[in-house]
Curated annotation (Swiss-Prot):
Disruption phenotype: RNAi-mediated knockdown causes a reduction in fatty acid uptake. RNAi-mediated knockdown in the intestine causes a severe defect in the expulsion step of the defecation cycle. Residues 407-537 form the P/Homo B domain. This is Endoprotease aex-5. It comes from Caenorhabditis elegans. Changing G184E: In sv76; intestinal lipid droplets are smaller and their number is reduced. Reduced uptake and accumulation of triglycerides in the intestine.
């Protein structure tokens, strides 16, 4: 058994993480039971107070008494001398931001009436309503007594990670209505505000936002919560969309997402649905968002009624598809059993989650990878306007802001109903990409799903760097676009993820093209790993 302590130092409360100035630590202690774990904690001046929810061997603890701040380093060093302590590391506090609704005006429309059509009503008419599916909205809480949500709500797949309680209700303020709005788009039952896309789904509410700071342990704990009972995690938040920030999941959270995608749902894989971001007006792009640009998440853009990508929407090479409604106020649930309206990429993640819930209702045996294959095959590229689409060698059209096109719920459920699970995933990795030329001729992946390039950019103004990846078949994917507002130094240990090569044969020579907009600047790009995942035909 492996036990992990989360040690909150000098905190006013062990639950609400308001101030990280004095440090938060994560320690892993092996081969002991819970009683011994608590004894070890007290020996080092800490007391384990409760278990984290998603790990049977993880504990939250706090100091027994005050010590001088300089003693922290001594405590860490002392604990590392113990044979039972595998590691101890300091956690950083950080903020996460809701993909807040845009200030669009107009009469609210229902989700099934969006233009261009997502063919949601047609999927319902085919008999699918997500009654066999569980969707958890990870946000600032949900009004679980709302007349349109209370029947769908399940406490078994819900938790409040802000106050560590079973009822994830939000504060009664418009500022904390976001989760309730997203939940309505997924699961509202038509009593007052309309029907959610997956109006028969079981609704989980995981309250994570609403405190001043998060940390890696809380975030990872929330995203691993009830991973064998929850099918879809709907996430409409992320790092700040200011065109300057670059953040990614920390170690514990990244492991939670990876483990869920590979092993959740009893081996079929959880589906983590992420909003691509609202930073388009700031020149932002989701390649700098490590939750969206992630091997194990599914991210979605948004288009307006004309079919053009929404001006506020962010694009990147990991965006899988898009939903409509970018210029609409979409009616949904509000606090205190009211109706409200929402737009922005927050809505896109919730709508996409609802559509995927219909797909799983059509075929509960689908894996997380099956969902990606179905979306790539059925998305409607012809609905997209005002941008140039690119075609890969497998015949799929794509664009960074819309992926493979507009989701089509009816085509998805029809294809899903008779879909046979894809073959086991094959992975090829190449290390030390010194010259940007990757010989992948010996790889068995003949149908690509994703390509991941990992490394660092050393540059005085990282926003001036552009990275493109060319496949052996000539398809070019922009892994890192220019970002004019970003004048920060360096981008370290980053994963650049692309779905643009979906269906291509990976064998042959791949080429990385790196340029800087600034002349006479010394910079380097250190790419350490090239990874392609897919199937062998």
């Amino acid at each position: 058994m492996k036990l992990i302590f989360l040690l909150l130092l000098f905190g006013v409360s062990p639950i609400v993480c308001q101030d990280f100035e004095d440090g938060v630590f994560l320690a892993k202690i092996t081969s002991i039971d819970e009683h011994d774990a608590r004894k070890i904690g007290r020996r080092f001046g800490f007391e384990a107070q409760w278990k984290l929810q998603s790990y049977t061997d993880v504990y939250v603890g706090r100091r027994l008494r005050r010590r001088k701040r300089g003693i922290e380093d001594e405590i860490v060093a002392e604990m590392m001398l113990s044979q039972q302590v595998q590691f101890i590391e300091k956690l950083q506090g950080f903020r996460r931001y809701k993909r807040a609704p845009m200030t669009n005006k107009g009469y609210p429309v229902h989700v099934w009436n969006l233009t261009p059509s997502l063919y949601i009503r047609e999927a319902w008419e085919d008999g699918f309503n997500a009654s066999r599916v569980t969707v958890a909205v990870v946000d600032d809480g949900v009004d679980i007594k709302h007349v349109d949500l209370k029947s769908a709500f399940s406490p078994r797949v819900s938790f409040d990670f802000v106050r560590f309680g079973d009822l994830p209700t939000p504060k009664n303020s418009k500022e904390f209505e976001h989760g309730t709005q997203c939940a309505g788009l997924v699961a509202m039952e038509g009593q007052q505000c309309g029907l959610g896309v997956g109006h028969g789904a079981t609704l989980g509410a995981i309250k994570l936002l609403g405190q001043d700071f998060l940390n890696d342990a809380l975030e990872g704990d929330a995203l691993a919560f009830q991973k064998d009972l929850i099918d879809i995690y709907s996430v409409s938040w992320g790092p700040k969309d200011d065109g300057k920030s670059a953040e990614k999941p920390a170690k514990f959270t990244e492991e939670a997402i990876k483990n869920g995608a590979l092993h959740g749902r009893n081996g079929k894989g959880n589906i983590f649905v992420w909003a691509s971001g609202n930073g388009g007006v700031n020149g932002d792009n989701c390649a700098y968002d490590g939750y969206v640009s992630n091997e194990y998440t599914l991210s979605f853009g948004v288009i307006d009624a004309s079919g053009a990508p929404a001006a506020y929407g962010e694009g990147c090479s990991s965006v899988l598809a898009a939903v409509s409604g970018g210029d609409a106020m979409i009616q949904t649930t509000g606090l205190e059993s009211t109706c409200s309206s929402i737009s922005g990429s927050s809505a896109s993640a919730a709508i996409a989650s609802g559509i995927i819930s219909l797909v799983l209702d059509a075929n509960p045996t689908l894996s997380q990878r099956d969902i990606q294959h179905l979306i790539a095959r059925t998305s409607n590229a012809s609905a997209i306007r005002d941008v140039e689409l690119y075609e890969n060698s497998a015949g799929l059209n794509f664009h960074p802001k819309v992926g493979f096109g507009l989701l089509n719920a009816q085509k998805l459920v029809v294809m899903a109903a008779t879909w046979e699970n894809v073959a086991p995933q094959v992975t090829c990795e190449k290390m030390n990409l010194a010259n940007g030329i990757i010989d992948n001729s010996d790889c068995d992946v003949t149908k690509v799903e994703r390509v991941i390039v990992s490394g660092s950019i050393i540059h005085p103004h990282r926003g001036q760097v552009q990275i493109r990846l060319e496949s052996p078949r000539g398809t070019i994917s922009e892994l890192l676009p220019l970002r004019p507002k970003d004048t920060s130094r360096d981008l370290l240990d980053w994963n650049f993820v692309s779905v643009n090569f979906f269906g291509e044969n990976s064998r042959g020579i791949w080429k990385l093209h790196v340029t800087s907009e600034e002349d006479d600047v010394d910079f380097r790009v250190e790419m350490k790993m090239f990874k392609v995942v897919g199937t062998m035909s």
